[in-house]
Amino acid sequence: MKKPLLLTLLCMILAGCDNPKSLESFTPEMASYSNEFDFDPLRGPVRDFSQTLMSENGEVAKQVTGTLSQEGCFDTLELHDLENNTGLALVLDANYYRDAQTLEKKVQLQGKCQLAALPSAGVTWETDDNGFVVSATGKEMKVEYRYDSEGYPLGKTTINSQNTLSVTAKPSADPRKKLDYTAVSRVDDRQVGNVTQSCEYDTYANPVDCRLVIVDESVKPAVSHHYTIKNRNDYS
């Protein structure tokens, strides 16, 4: 038997030399939390991660860090928006997330560890039969979320008494490059912005380094903002 054919058969037996890990879908918790807290969803046995958004000047604009249990629940989740001087640090405690500093109950959970309610803001979340958060309802607004067949978030629509804001994302056709996407933002029927992201990936098809371009079309001429995202993904 010729060596090239032998190597080909060995690769087939070993499930692919260049594709050592099969793709996993995004869990309901990962997809829903990424939607609500604005970070890139990950798949596979992630146990510890960070995502750092950096401006063209090399300054940190936003950072998200988290740890996950074997069951895929977020044990901790910390978010810092340095551009707007806001932040949040949550720690899991039974059916709630508490503020990591004050220990005040912040987020109520349902099921295994899915979002249920944010009592202080009067917000409740609803899930579909697969456990994905599909809507959030508050006193003066409602948000509807969309996903593809793998659980990848495809955007959301926010409706209030004044207008309707929609974000529609289109990921790459390559299933291993879901975080290569374009997205369009609209207020009512008027396009106000677009986003393009491209990434390098690890063997779990999770992003490692990304380039993000945000275009603000609400002003004339439109203004582009360029960012890089540094990702750290640790697995069990």
Q: Where are these predicted regions, by residue range?
A:
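Sec-dependent bacterial lipoprotein signal peptides
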Residues: 1-15
